[in-house]
Amino acid sequence: MTHANTTTPPFIAVVPARLASTRLPNKPLADIGGKPMVVRVAERARESGAQQVLVASDAQAVLDAARAHGFEAVLTRADHPSGTDRLAEVAAQFGWSDDTIVVNVQGDEPLIDPALVCGVASHLAASGGCAIATAAHPITDPAEIFNPNVVKVVLDARGVALYFSRAPIPWARDAYQPHWPNVAAMPTPPAPAVVHRHIGLYAYRAQFLRTYPSLAISPIEQVEALEQLRAMWHGERIAVLVTHDVPLPGVDTPADLARVQALFGS
């Protein structure tokens, strides 16, 4: 169950989508049950209760696909290094007020839970002093703790992120050893309240999005290859909504696409 503020504030959902995917070319236009993937994502965003749903892309084909299914679409530059940069351009184009809440719904998440989208928006609205909100869930599988592709987050007493890392954090000094021969030999993780897996869903205040492009890339962001560390490096606080509902995975590879297509009967 997702725990968040029960009062849903007005918010805008933006679905950034780009065609230039190395592992899965033309990913936003991949057919899923008779509709392009980007449309499936936008539909989930609409189900979240967002006041407005926008598809943002540098590809006319993506914009045309979104508009053909009744969604508003906006053209963005092709040189954005991240989805956050693309959102920043959209925020600048629309001139949203500083307190407007904008949720980044990644364009390769056709199975995203609409309640989680709404949840991070509500969580940000309830988290004064934070410019960003995201989500996480407890880790119970030892293999996930030691998997660098699983991003971990450590929280403070108020549920604000202390750090995100691909490393196993926090390190259980008395339980872990530097190396194990195999996953089966790894110990049970510390209490689930301590070890959390980050979920790549973000809500932002428009004021932050306007300042984001001017923030210098940080050393820790480069080392970890985690763009959220740029905001933390520059002193921004990130509120974390903890959910016990493990989200379904997104689409990164042809195998992922086949799995999702099967769910939709493609």
From Swiss-Prot:
- Report the top EC class in one word: transferase
Indicate what this protein is called per its UniProt record.
3-deoxy-manno-octulosonate cytidylyltransferase
- Pfam families with a match to the protein in the record: CTP_transf_3 (PF02348)
List keywords of the entry alphabetically. Answer: Cytoplasm, Lipopolysaccharide biosynthesis, Nucleotidyltransferase, Transferase
What catalytic activity is recorded?
3-deoxy-alpha-D-manno-oct-2-ulosonate + CTP = CMP-3-deoxy-beta-D-manno-octulosonate + diphosphate
User: What InterPro entries would the database entry show?
Assistant: Cytidylyl_trans, KdsB, Nucleotide-diphossugar_trans
Q: What is its EC number?
A: 2.7.7.38
- Name the Gene Ontology biological process terms: CMP-keto-3-deoxy-D-manno-octulosonic acid biosynthetic process; lipopolysaccharide biosynthetic process
Q: Which domain of life, per UniProt?
A: Bacteria
What is the scientific name of the source organism? Answer: Paraburkholderia xenovorans (strain LB400)
- Role noted for this protein: Activates KDO (a required 8-carbon sugar) for incorporation into bacterial lipopolysaccharide in Gram-negative bacteria.
Name a GO CC annotation attached to this entry.
cytosol
| MF terms (GO), sorted A to Z | 3-deoxy-manno-octulosonate cytidylyltransferase activity
Q: In which pathway does it act?
A: Nucleotide-sugar biosynthesis; CMP-3-deoxy-D-manno-octulosonate biosynthesis; CMP-3-deoxy-D-manno-octulosonate from 3-deoxy-D-manno-octulosonate and CTP: step 1/1; Bacterial outer membrane biogenesis; lipopolysaccharide biosynthesis
Report the subcellular localization: Cytoplasm
Coarse class of the protein's main subcellular location: cytoplasm
CDD domains from the UniProt entry: CMP-KDO-Synthetase
This protein's gene is called kdsB
Give the family from UniProt: Belongs to the KdsB family.
